[in-house]
């Protein structure tokens, strides 16, 4: 394949969203483990409701919307705005576990990118702990991934990670997990459109169930996941 092939950015995106990416995503459930323990998520239907509810009311209006602005800031070489957005997103996590998950995955990806020779990841201020969307946006810009495709990839990776956790926790069969992912394709596209069209004063939303599930998970007696 020619090095300038237009397919290369998409192939890099596929690698970025792959579950084999060494960022530790398999260790986290984002409160889903408590939701299963509490009987809120018990089957395929309730799992889909939980995952897609958070996609619409939390990830799209916070992570996705800020990620969209991060990409724009990087393309303008506006490092100050990029750092401001990273701080904003990091400060928006509603529990210590959610913040720790985001920072650990973000720093893992940033470190990986640095080792792969991505200069922007290397130059990210040492005192500035990268959120995962920030590190993802650096990767997307480096490999010339179209911003809207990068946003789709980020939203897809969030949903897929939740489904993989649900397969272990509920438990769901793998076929049920695939049914949820197939049904989620159109929902992800709507989340992408919502994230990229929000005004600044519309960014952010309260997801009480996520916040409480994550906080309760911190003292849950028996746990498979870190969040």
Swiss-Prot record:
Keywords assigned by UniProt, alphabetized: Chaperone, Cytoplasm, Nickel insertion
MF annotations from Gene Ontology: nickel cation binding
Main location: cytoplasm
InterPro entries documented for this protein: UreF, UreF_sf
Keyword set includes Transcription: no
GO cellular component, one term: cytoplasm
One Pfam family of this chain: UreF
Record's subcellular location: Cytoplasm
Subunit structure: UreD, UreF and UreG form a complex that acts as a GTP-hydrolysis-dependent molecular chaperone, activating the urease apoprotein by helping to assemble the nickel containing metallocenter of UreC. The UreE protein probably delivers the nickel.
Family classification: Belongs to the UreF family.
Function: Required for maturation of urease via the functional incorporation of the urease nickel metallocenter.
Name this polypeptide is given: Urease accessory protein UreF 2
Source organism: Brucella anthropi (strain ATCC 49188 / DSM 6882 / CCUG 24695 / JCM 21032 / LMG 3331 / NBRC 15819 / NCTC 12168 / Alc 37)
């Amino acid at each position: 394949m020619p090095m300038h092939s237009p397919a290369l950015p998409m192939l890099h995106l596929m690698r970025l969203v792959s579950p084999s990416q060494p960022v530790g995503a398999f260790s986290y459930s984002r409160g889903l483990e408590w939701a299963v323990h509490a009987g809120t998520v018990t089957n395929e239907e309730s799992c889909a409701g939980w995952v897609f509810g958070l996609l619409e009311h939390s990830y799209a209006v916070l992570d996705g919307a800020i990620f969209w602005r991060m990409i724009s800031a990087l393309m303008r070489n506006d490092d100050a705005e990029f750092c401001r957005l990273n701080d904003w997103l990091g400060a928006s996590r509603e529990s210590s576990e959610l913040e720790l998950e985001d920072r650990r995955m973000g720093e893992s990806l940033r470190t990986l990118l640095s080792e792969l020779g991505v200069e922007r990841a290397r130059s990210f201020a040492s005192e500035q702990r990268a959120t995962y969307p920030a590190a993802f946006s650096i990767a997307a810009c480096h490999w010339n991934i179209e911003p809207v495709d990068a946003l789709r990839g980020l939203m897809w990776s969030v949903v897929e990670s939740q489904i993989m956790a649900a397969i272990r926790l509920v438990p769901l069969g793998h076929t049920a997990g695939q049914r949820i992912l197939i049904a989620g394709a159109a929902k992800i596209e709507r989340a992408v459109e919502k994230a990229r069209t929000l005004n600044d004063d519309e960014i952010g939303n309260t997801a009480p169930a996520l916040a409480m599930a994550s906080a309760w998970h911190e003292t849950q007696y028996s746990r498979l996941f870190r969040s």
